[in-house]
Amino acid sequence: MKIRKYVAMALCATVAASMAACGNSNDTQKETQPAAADNTADAATADSTADNTADNASDAASGDLSGTIVITGSTSVEKILNDMKDEFEALNPDVKIQYTGSGSSAGIKDTLNKVNNIGASSRNLKDDELVDGLQQEVFAYDGIAVIVNPANEAIADITEEQLADIYSGKITNWSELGGNDAEIFVVSREASSGTRSAFEELIGLEDAGGLTENAATSEGNGPVQAAVAENENAIGYVSFSFIDDTVKPLTISGVEPTAENAKSGAYALSRPFLFCYFDDSVTDAGKAFLEFALSQQAQDIVTSHGGITVTE
């Protein structure tokens, strides 16, 4: 994680005599994360990093930070990121964070094109998105919940294969799964959505023939949630933080969509929340925000929105 570099830099500023040695040490720590790291390995790395930075939240409020941090990308991180933004701006009144929820793919593209300072993604980066110098920081984990309308009492559990069959159009009626004789109203996300990309990959939708042309698409977790809440025969998928009593989450092969199950890997539909950036695109304020995202203050925000912390 690049955040270790910033901690080392802070130590160097405090102990001026060791500045040169620390600079050399920082250089040896530079590395770009792989596109799809194992959840357990990610968790171990993130846990170690967060332990080193959890007590450093006050450092973000140095009073010397100023400027604008431009972040674009995932809508799944919207609630978490907006609260982190508010907290960080309160600590640093001269810093403003401009966050645009444009979807993970768009945020990553903006980062690669250096349109933003930091990209936010709710999926691992693909091989063709990994370029020299691109850095990643996992700041939380999330699970993707499959939801139906609460009136759909007969359906409580589903498998990944059944999801692929529904979303590819092979299964079109709830009766085929032991439910009511009613046509399934399939709700998906827009093409640029990181949640959609992760969902389709996790259920093997490409191998099943791709998304059915009969699927309705909604831009954002909220609209998907609303569509399912309004239609007794609908099925959709959202981040865990969008589960409430207006929809009913299904178990996946008997495993409940909980934070513990997602972090451990027992729950099949889980993914990381991460930032991606280039060193030369991130200002001092941006570096401080990346550090803040792993602090206890920020991780408490993750928890408050049903996310899974890097130390959990």
PLM regions: where:
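Exported/periplasmic ABC-transporter solute-binding proteins
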Residues: 23-37, 42-47, 51, 55-112, ...
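Hydrophobic helical h-region of N-terminal Sec-dependent signal peptides
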Residues: 11-16
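Bacterial Sec-dependent N-terminal signal peptides
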Residues: 1-10
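C-terminal motif of bacterial Sec signal peptides marking the signal peptidase cleavage site
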Residues: 17-21
